[in-house]
Amino acid sequence: MSTGLRYKSKLATPEDKQDIDKQYVGFATLPNQVHRKSVKKGFDFTLMVAGESGLGKSTLVHSLFLTDLYKDRKLLSAEERINQTVEILKHTVDIEEKGVKLKLTIVDTPGFGDAVNNSECWKPITDYVDQQFEQYFRDESGLNRKNIQDNRVHCCLYFISPFGHGLRPVDVGFMKALHEKVNIVPLIAKADCLVPSEIRKLKDRIREEIDKFGIHVYQFPECDSDEDEDFKQQDRELKESAPFAVIGSNTVVEAKGQRVRGRLYPWGIVEVENQAHCDFVKLRNMLIRTHMHDLKDVTCDVHYENYRAHCIQQMTSKLTQDSRMESPIPILPLPTPDAETEKLIRMKDEELRRMQEMLQKMKQQMQDQ
């Protein structure tokens, strides 16, 4: 039964204040405690960018976070790009804004989609995502779990060329290979190459093909009923705008007496942050201001849990098949374990046996979702 406090207009006496203090437990300060602890610890976010060369990936990242991560980048010739294999490059930078610290990691994929034969060109990328899951699983299962570093990919911005008539086979192959492992946010790159009617047609075509090929891109969560109308309107606009048509620019130009980031053409100026020109502001708001935490939650609660359940299932199946095995066989090929690793595996063996009993319950929960 809740107790309501009625405040009168007269000045409160010391006795009244004592009565109020007696009825105040103090757990209402929990959000403040969590906020202070989170700000002190800082936040981390790993963003992958993928797509063929020349679509403005690095420029868009610079525009989003106002940080140049590609100072030492070497530009390759067309011939070098054709012969280049897919690489995985990480760029990490610490950003601070109003006392809030963010450790941002950008995972770049140079060489993707540039070869003459692009079959299975996404394999190094899927392997990288799996390796981060595996490393986190090992750290989480270890004895020292205080300072686990989260390198899991929380979001993948996939750049689609504006010059085609929809998704290319390599686009479909990439997204289908990763859609169960990472949150994919498709983008139409270099939207200033298209007029508004062409952008609308291309968006409709991409949405149709995403449904046709059964690709699971990141789904915006539904708004709570108690959210204010402005937030609900913003959420509707985000959902209607996907896939986002974006423009990036590191150049400051003058438009109507104001200095803005944009591109200068003979016919006028395209402003990066003008919502009438592109969806850059919507993407930035979604990625940083409204949905960054949800992207991390979906990574942890859905994609990583699927990987973890698969690992546990394989381990317990192996234990069931051969009870004489001293330790479960890891999922991915590993170097020969040392004495400390063997000891750790033996200690975890009993825990894995208990987890086998929980496996059926976990499967049922996943099916219910």
Curated annotation (Swiss-Prot):
The modification Omega-N-methylarginine is found at residue 168. Pfam families: Septin (PF00735). Phosphorylated by DYRK1A. CDD domains: CDC_Septin. Disruption phenotype: Mice have a normal life-span and show no apparent abnormalities, including synaptic properties and hippocampal neuron growth. In platelets, hyperresponsive degranulation phenotype. Its main location: cytoplasm. It comes from the Eukaryota. Residues 41-314 form the Septin-type G domain. Disulfide bonds: none annotated. Belongs to the TRAFAC class TrmE-Era-EngA-EngB-Septin-like GTPase superfamily. Septin GTPase family. Filament-forming cytoskeletal GTPase. Involved in cytokinesis (Potential). May play a role in platelet secretion. This is Septin-5.
